[in-house]
């Protein structure tokens, strides 16, 4: 069976609200609702989410369609960027480029990419240790740590080249549960048809 990593789609950006508390925007919610109607979502037997609002909202829409309960896991959160707080999109993109290009260093107090990769990978692998590989599972989280997890699963060095395209999130990559081999690269969530 398959595992899928789902990044939350577009969020309601509010510089006055801590980033982990941002919720989905209207567009993001619409994309998640469209995705929830797809057959692969109904086949999910387990959904595990980051504890950030936007991820939980996405996971809940998928879980409602699958008829399962969302499990929340703190260690699946996005890389810790609280040291800088909100950065306007152009500044954030430059910072993200630096984050991926310098994985052993911290960008102005951010969690280092190597540490975020170890955290997300350890969380996912711990969950999979006790998971029945015959049951499809979704991990719902964030683009940065999702990319770091994908690099770990493929054995590739940390690189923004492995990041989701298009901006705004709302993508999936899938991997086989039997051997954890990545089976498809980032695909818009509402376009992915399963494996």
Question: Regions from the language model: what does each represent?
Answer:
Residues 10, 143-144:
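Alpha-helix/helix-capping structural signal
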Residues 2-57, 61, 111-120:
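Loop-to-helix element that buttresses phosphate recognition and phosphoryl-transfer chemistry
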Residues 3, 135-143:
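Generic beta-sheet signal
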Residues 5, 10-16, 93-107:
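Short, basic/glycine-rich phosphate-binding loops at helix/coil junctions
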Residues 68-72, 78-90, 133-135, 151-195:
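Acidic, low-complexity terminal tails and accessory targeting/binding regions
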Residues 99-131:
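Internal catalytic-core helix/loop-beta-alpha segment
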């Amino acid at each position: 069976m398959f595992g899928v990593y789902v990044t939350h789609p577009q969020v309601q950006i509010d510089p006055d609200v801590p980033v982990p508390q941002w919720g989905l925007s209207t567009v993001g919610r619409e994309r998640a609702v469209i995705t929830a109607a797809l057959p692969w979502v109904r086949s999910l037997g387990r959904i595990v989410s980051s504890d950030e609002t936007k991820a939980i909202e996405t996971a809940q829409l998928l879980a409602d369609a699958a008829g399962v309960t969302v499990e929340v896991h703190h260690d699946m959160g996005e890389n810790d960027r609280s040291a800088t707080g909100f950065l306007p999109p152009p500044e954030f993109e430059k910072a993200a480029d630096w984050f991926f290009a310098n994985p052993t260093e911290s960008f102005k107090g951010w969690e280092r990419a190597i540490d975020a990769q170890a955290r997300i990978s350890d969380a996912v692998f711990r969950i999979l240790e006790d998971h029945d590989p015959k049951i499809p599972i979704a991990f719902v989280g964030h683009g940065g740590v999702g990319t770091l997890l994908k690099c770990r699963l493929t054995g590739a060095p940390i690189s923004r080249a492995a990041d989701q395209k298009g901006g705004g999130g709302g993508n999936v990559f899938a991997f086989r549960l039997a051997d954890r081999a990545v089976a498809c690269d980032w695909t818009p969530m509402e376009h992915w048809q399963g494996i």
